[in-house]
A protein has these predicted regions:
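Active-site-proximal alpha-helical scaffold in enzymes
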Residues: 1-30, 62-102, 161-168
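Conserved catalytic cysteine-centered active-site region
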Residues: 1-24, 31-63, 106, 121-151, ...
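Glutamate identity and glutamate-enriched acidic tracts
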Residues: 30, 39, 53, 74, ...
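Short acidic, glycine/serine/threonine-rich loops at helix termini
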Residues: 35-40, 94-98, 190-192
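Condensing-enzyme catalytic core mediating Claisen C-C bond formation in acyl metabolism
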Residues: 50, 54, 73-74, 83-87, ...
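Polyampholytic, low-complexity intrinsically disordered segments
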Residues: 84-87, 92-164
Length: 197
């Protein structure tokens, strides 16, 4: 799941560079919303080390929370730093009409306040997005120190890239994008890493 599309692109580049192919269509697809959340979570958990991590009770949020805690201890990263990332990411997503979440954190905050008013509940009055993200009623802890807005959703998506040999690129476009390098690496399971950061 996590890297199959990028590996497909790299394999396409290698295939073209070797002369084996002139044209490669590389893509990736992820369809995760047809299963109930608990089943999807179980499937995702198989990406972790089944002997040491999954059976010890780790979930993916728990693994990332462990790394976040280590980063906080080693570099002084704060929850506010993570909140700033969430705000920035939602701001960028709001600029993309195809984004899963086309709302800024401020949009979400205002919608929550409007919903509370509509339901006759006390209307929260957050000063800004940071104060909203500090509110555990709207941004609960998923796996400390990570909160709801720090996590990625279960989602569907797909993308593809048409790769062509340089000598025929102009047959497809007047402004080709050139790939000047590629690389690939793989990490160890969390318990085998020398550093969690």
């Amino acid at each position: 799941a996590c890297a199959s599309a990028s590996v497909a692109i790299r394999q396409g580049i290698i295939g073209i560079a070797s002369g084996l192919y002139d044209v490669v269509l590389a893509g990736g697809v992820e369809k995760m919303t047809t299963l109930p959340t608990n089943e999807t979570t179980l499937v995702l958990a198989t990406g972790a080390d089944m002997v040491w991590e999954t059976y010890a009770g780790y979930t993916f949020p728990g693994l990332y929370a462990t790394m976040a805690t280590a980063h906080m201890n080693e570099y002084g990263t704060t929850s506010e730093d993570l909140m700033a990332i969430a705000i920035k990411n939602h701001d960028n997503g709001a600029l993309n009409p195809m984004a899963q979440f086309g709302q800024t954190v401020r949009d979400v905050m205002n919608a929550r306040a409007a919903k509370a008013k509509e339901k006759g509940r006390p209307v929260p009055s957050w000063a800004d997005e940071m104060e909203f993200l500090h509110d555990p009623a709207y941004n609960p802890v998923v796996a400390w120190p990570l909160k709801l807005f720090d996590r990625c959703p279960i989602t569907d998506g797909a993308a593809c890239v048409l790769l062509v040999a340089e000598e025929i690129a102009r047959d497809f476009t007047d402004t080709p994008v050139y790939i000047i390098g590629t690389g690939q690496a793989s990490g160890n399971a969390l318990h085998d890493r020398e550093s969690l950061t």
